[in-house]
UniProtKB/Swiss-Prot annotation:
The gene is BZIP10. Forms a heterodimer with BZIP1, BZIP2, BZIP9, BZIP11, BZIP44, BZIP53 and BZIP63. Interacts with ABI3 and forms a complex made of ABI3, BZIP53 and BZIP10. Binding with LSD1 leads to cytoplasmic retention. It is found in: Nucleus; Cytoplasm. The lineage of its organism: Eukaryota, Viridiplantae, Streptophyta, Embryophyta, Tracheophyta. Pfam families: bZIP_1, bZIP_C. A motif (Nuclear localization signal) lies at residues 219-226. Residues 89-98 have a biased composition (Basic and acidic residues). Residues 217-236 are annotated as: Basic motif. Its main location: nucleus. This is Basic leucine zipper 10. PANTHER family: BASIC LEUCINE ZIPPER 10, BASIC LEUCINE ZIPPER 63. PROSITE patterns: BZIP, BZIP_BASIC.
Length: 411
């Protein structure tokens, strides 16, 4: 248990209220014999009077402030539990009798008339004694070893009149606040990872100036660890920035590829629409061709496909006939024309001279006007009946002159 006592722990039921004097208006002081008190209280009072008289005789009154400062500084230190034995109070009082009850007012053989004042004086004395005992016990215990950092070394707390309580006992709140501030500084300095070079130099100078060689090595190791951690953080930041740059580049390429894909999809859609339009045009042209064939069939009375085949057959049958010096009239067969009346003509009237003039020689063919004038007339008559609006394709199947027809093949 802690040996520090609080004012709230002491209440009125610990001692009885002294009886009211018979003549309160009289100014005659009342002695201790006239007040009925219990034996322990009077014994404690006599003990305090003896201690106060011995303290006054041994020390001057000017040392009261030093005693109060010593009590406040000792009270601000952490208390040690497990030493709550009140049997050693007399031993501590005998050893340090000079420091007891220096802040308490001087008491006399007479007791104050008012019972409340008397109770307050007793409370003050008791609290002073308790504070003295606590200070002696804390002083007898060896303080904890301080850390290597100079910030953790506790400075002696200087008490001021404002920190002293109403009863002359100093409060330990400033010391606790200071200790809390030191611990918070240590925690923040240990948890914080961002240090500047100037702070590192200051810390190194402070640590190397007031520490042992082992502590100096430890501090240097800590500084090197911080520097390595700083370098690693810098490398990580550079890597992160590089990765972010690559990500931005990839995002740009991705956006460009998406644009190209959208353009290709648009072109594909346009091509598909154009293909459908062309297919529709092809179907329309096929329908028009069928209508034209029906019109030709209705006008000519025959299938245009058969007409095209017959014209091709006539072209294949017009082959030249070879001979040495003469051509037979029966060797030339006119083309078959189904709607021509000239086919019934006799072939006797159609002929080509068999003997050429002697001056031209055998290798020269006769002119068309002399050799094939009747045949030319027949062909002209055939073309006259066949060519007019008989071909639906708009081109003539028969040649208009005989210049395209070979008359003789030279050996």
């Amino acid at each position: 248990m802690n040996s520090i006592f609080s004012i709230d722990d002491f209440s009125d039921p610990f001692w009885e209220t002294p009886p009211i004097p018979l003549n309160p208006d009289s100014s005659k002081p009342v002695t201790a014999d006239e007040v009925s008190q219990s034996q322990p209280e009077w014994t404690f009072e006599m003990f305090l009077e003896e201690i106060s008289s011995s303290a006054v005789s041994s020390e001057p009154l000017g040392n009261n402030n030093n005693a109060i400062v010593g009590v406040s500084s000792a009270q601000s230190l952490p208390s040690v539990s497990g030493q709550n034995d009140f049997e050693d109070d007399s031993r501590f009082r005998d050893r340090d009798s000079g420091n007891l009850d220096c802040a308490a007012p001087m008491t006399t053989k007479t007791v104050i008339v008012d019972s409340d004042d008397y109770r307050r004086v007793l409370k003050n004395k008791l609290e002073t004694e308790c504070a003295t005992v606590v200070s002696l016990r804390v002083g007898s215990v060896k303080p904890e070893d301080s850390t290597s950092s100079p910030e953790t070394q506790l400075q002696p707390v200087q008490s001021s009149p404002l920190t002293q309580g109403e009863l002359g006992v100093t409060s330990s709140l400033p010391a606790e606040v200071k200790k809390t501030g030191v611990s918070m500084k240590q925690v923040t300095s240990g948890s914080s990872r961002e240090y500047s070079d100037d702070e590192d130099l200051d810390e190194e100078n402070e640590t190397t100036g007031s520490l042992k060689p082992e502590d100096v090595k430890k501090s240097r190791r800590m500084l090197s660890n911080r520097e390595s951690a700083r370098r690693s953080r810098r490398r990580k930041q550079e890597q992160t920035s590089d990765l972010e740059t690559q990500v931005n580049d990839l995002k740009g390429e991705h956006s460009s590829l998406l644009k190209q894909l959208s353009n290709m999809n648009h072109k594909y859609d346009e091509a598909a629409v154009g293909n459908r339009i062309l297919k529709a045009d092809i179907e329309t042209l096929r329908a028009k061709v069928k209508m034209a064939e029906e019109t030709v069939k209705r006008v000519t009375g025959m299938n245009p496909m058969l007409l095209g085949r017959s014209s091709g057959h006539n072209n294949n049958n017009r082959m030249p006939i070879t001979g040495n010096n003469r051509m037979d009239s029966s060797s030339i067969i006119p083309a078959y024309q189904p709607h021509s009346n000239l086919n019934h003509m006799s072939n006797q009237n159609i002929g080509i001279p068999t003997i050429l003039p002697p001056r031209l020689g055998n290798n020269f063919a006769a002119p068309p006007s002399q050799t094939s004038s009747p045949l030319q007339r027949i062909r002209n008559g055939q073309n006259h009946h066949v060519t007019p609006s008989a071909n639906p394709y708009g081109w003539n199947t028969e040649p208009q002159n005989d210049s395209a027809w070979p008359k003789k093949c030279v050996d």
